[in-house]
């Protein structure tokens, strides 16, 4: 193992993004606390902001071989807080059905705030960063051994995400407006709905990961949350960018991408990665041997999705440009 893969990377640039996110969440925490006169908002958003900052910082400074552990720290901190404190102890239904129930009832509690800020409004800033850094379902599934999908996406199977989303919405409308059954807040019924729903997610998520050999299969094919996130993430301020003058087209980023995005296709078009499937996990940033991949702020948007589907090779060496001897050595090492 090379020294670089064992070395900590204590460079100033790795402290910038964690600091920005910490400031954003602390601002939200203090603002809502003062507006609502409720200390819950101060604790809630401060904890989430600190957890995100810790995970992002660790992801940046840890040795390359274990950078993924930084993201796991945030996933477990935020995920356990949401599940244990809000879901189990607070008896709030943090599933999407709970959000629909509370929204139609006009109730502004933890679950409502979580969806409106993290999964809808926040996507205009950090895209689907929730999925990459805070989802409690994938916090467990990411411990499975299939981090790098090999076969590509199954065409049209992602349509089930929309079936799930509108099915959940229809179920809530039916229960509330046809059966006239309004859930009681912080009840055992809400807790049961939350626990049973999560159990189903974990079982189905594990089965999909096992049979498709892809930890993120449930994200791609069944989870309804991306339906909420897609509009905002298309126009998010923070996105992945690949600097063409530094890229040697080794395709390490595409080989490691857990969401099967053809990252270099965006580079060839002179654009940042506009795919709504990007979860801002930063894997591509930290596997790049030439530091060509970066997480940048800007204003753009687009609707073209460049994704790798079943049967396509992990990477095509198209448009390879002449590279220096030192860059060739890097590519040869990666391709062994």
Predicted regions and their residues:
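Non-ligating segments of multi-cofactor redox enzymes
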Residues: 1-267, 276, 286, 291-336
């Amino acid at each position: 193992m090379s020294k670089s893969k064992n070395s900590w990377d204590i460079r100033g640039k790795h402290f910038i993004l964690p600091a920005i996110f910490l400031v954003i969440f602390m601002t939200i925490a203090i603002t809502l606390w003062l507006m609502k006169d409720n200390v819950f908002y101060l604790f809630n958003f401060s904890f989430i902001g600190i957890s995100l900052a810790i995970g992002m910082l660790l992801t940046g400074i840890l040795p390359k071989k274990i950078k993924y552990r930084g993201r796991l720290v945030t996933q477990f901190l935020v995920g356990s807080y949401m599940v244990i404190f809000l879901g189990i102890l607070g008896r709030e239904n943090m599933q999407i059905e709970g959000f629909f129930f509370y929204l139609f009832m006009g109730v502004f509690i933890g679950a409502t705030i979580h969806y409106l800020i993290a999964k809808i409004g926040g996507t205009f800033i950090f895209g689907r960063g929730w999925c990459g850094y805070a989802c409690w379902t994938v916090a467990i599934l990411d411990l499975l051994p299939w981090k790098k999908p090999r076969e590509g996406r199954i065409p049209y199977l992602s349509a089930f995400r929309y079936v799930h989303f509108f099915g959940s919405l229809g179920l809530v409308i039916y229960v509330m407006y046809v059966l006239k059954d309004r859930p009681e807040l912080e009840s055992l019924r809400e807790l049961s709905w939350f626990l049973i729903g999560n159990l189903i997610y974990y079982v189905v998520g594990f089965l999909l990961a096992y049979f498709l050999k892809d930890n993120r299969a449930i994200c791609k094919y069944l989870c309804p949350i991306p339906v909420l996130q897609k509009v905002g993430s298309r126009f998010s301020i923070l996105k992945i960018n690949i600097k063409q003058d530094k890229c040697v087209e080794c395709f390490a980023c595409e080989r490691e991408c857990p969401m099967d995005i053809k990252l270099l296709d965006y580079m060839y078009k002179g654009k940042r990665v506009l795919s709504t499937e990007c979860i801002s996990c930063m894997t591509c940033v930290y596997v790049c041997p030439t530091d060509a991949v970066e997480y940048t702020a800007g204003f753009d948007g687009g609707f073209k999705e460049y994704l790798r589907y079943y049967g396509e090779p992990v990477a095509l060496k198209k448009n390879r440009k002449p590279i220096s001897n030192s860059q060739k050595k890097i590519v040869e090492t990666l391709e062994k």
